[in-house]
Amino acid sequence: MGGRLNDLIQVAYGGKNVILSMMKNKTRQTSSVFINNLNSLNNNNNNISLKDKFKDLKDLKDNLNEKKINNDNDDDDEDNLIFDEKKDFLNENKNPELNYIKSKGHKIPSSQTSRFWEFTKLAVGVGAGFLGEKTKRTIDSSSSSSSPSSSYSAIFTDTNAERMAESFSRMRGAALKIGQVLSIQDESFLPPKFVEILDRVRKNANPIPLEQLYNTMSNELGENWRSKFQLFQDDPIAAASIGQVHRAITLDGKEVAVKVQYPGVADSITSDIKNLSSLLKMIVPETAYIEKSLESARSELLLETDYLNEASNQLKFKSLLESSINSGTNGSFKYLKDLYVPNVIMELTTKRILTTEFVHGTSIDKITIENHNQETRDWISKNILSLCLAELFEFNFMQVDPNWTNFVVDFENKRINLLDFGACRNYKSEFLFNYLKSIEGGVNRDINQILEYSLKLGYLTGDENKQMNDAQAKSILILSEPFSKLYYKENNLKTYPFNEKQIAKRISQLIPTMLKNRLKPPPEETYSLHRKLSGCYLVCSKLKSNINSTLIFNHFKNIFYKNYK
């Protein structure tokens, strides 16, 4: 199992260094030299010429900041259009629970040229910052700048976090997605200050100007789009990686959420992924198998830009959840009854606009140990863990985006609203059977069973050395701890204290061994699965939950075996 770094790689939308092949003009050739020099430095630790390289890159950065790509005046002129205070609804009585975005609208760069330019500036800035940090550490005799961890920490500095946050927020799309993924890592994976800075990316992405908003609404719903609503709030209540969300009231009086896709995002996914790879190659070793994850990530993100597909996923998920709750035969009612999926308003939904029932509540990123008691936090964690296991072993269909804002707690009605079904996938029964067997091996502390089913799943080839086999077995043992009665008994536990056990940190300690000894990439299905499971564990850890996870696991395990054919 690839651990936390592999989880990042799998969702970071990296790949081959295609930036180099795209570079044709002088600026791009210079950037190519920059990337090659940076990779050479990172791989060979050629500290003799470090100061000279840093000076060259500083000059390049200054030069790039003075240049401007003219692209028919389409995107590079960042006109800052301020949202009007029009006669939109709720201007006089806005919901205080919601954070309306009244900042300047930033025009999103939508052409390939303008987005390439943004990535080039970011790469140069991050690279110059990296070399500056390496130079400082080389001069400091107390620092061992030749170590891999030194290169890693030289990338993840506060200054580079600020660069990424600003750039990702401006570009949205795949770029902003990586910022959001980085922002929900725990402190065992990234420096706390780095996570804190990038958390702004997740919470405060820039909205688009009204001009772009109105153009999209007109293109998708017609020039008379406002006539399809009683009221429409121009100020978005959320701005994320692919689109932003507005409140509205339909003609029949329903309060709805209207998600509007950013212009050009769908067309930029592939090139964005290729451009991001140039940044990842500074820190990611070859054995991380970026190439394998690239196509999966690209396909997943492209599906997220199709809101008709998301509407279909949401309706399917709603049907599966309600059928399970209402069946009354398998006992899932008590595990899933407090979960809710909003309705979809299909007549106001297109490929670029998604309209759904508006739900109220507090996203789980705002739930803290200071403002909610243990019982409430445990209730939330039980629901999130039950949902994750139901998706795998009962529905065989999973929403794989663990963004904390996708879970909204409605305390008044005591339910958790589930949002954002753009990233979903089905799992075949054969894969789930082998995966469950490997987890059961961990639950029963059976190393042979873990390795047997790791081989069947495709984690191993059978030719791995003892170090790799041991690391694989340990990762499964750690992952399965919350579900193991034997582990509870051995450690005198009645419930599993997620925060104390630090699952992510312990698995991350196995990463160097795996990256050094791995012979093949992890199975493709686990990229998204482990992103979701990791997110689930992080929620339980953040809330300092103490729950009997064995009961939940055994329930959904039994459902799977009952239905398995």
UniProtKB/Swiss-Prot annotation:
UniProt keywords, alphabetically: ATP-binding, Coiled coil, Kinase, Nucleotide-binding, Serine/threonine-protein kinase, Transferase
MF annotations from Gene Ontology: ATP binding; protein serine/threonine kinase activity
Active site: D401
InterPro entries (alphabetical): ABC1_dom, ADCK3_dom, Atypical_kinase_ADCK, Kinase-like_dom_sf, Prot_kinase_dom
Coiled coil regions, renumbered to chain: 44-77
Binding positions for ATP per the UniProt entry: I237, A238, A239, A240, S241, I242, G243, Q244, V245, K259
EC number: 2.7.11.-
Any single biological process term in GO: ubiquinone biosynthetic process
Domain Protein kinase residue range list: 231-565
Family: Belongs to the protein kinase superfamily. ADCK protein kinase family.
The protein's name in its UniProt record: Probable serine/threonine-protein kinase abkA
Taxonomic path: Eukaryota, Amoebozoa, Evosea, Eumycetozoa, Dictyostelia
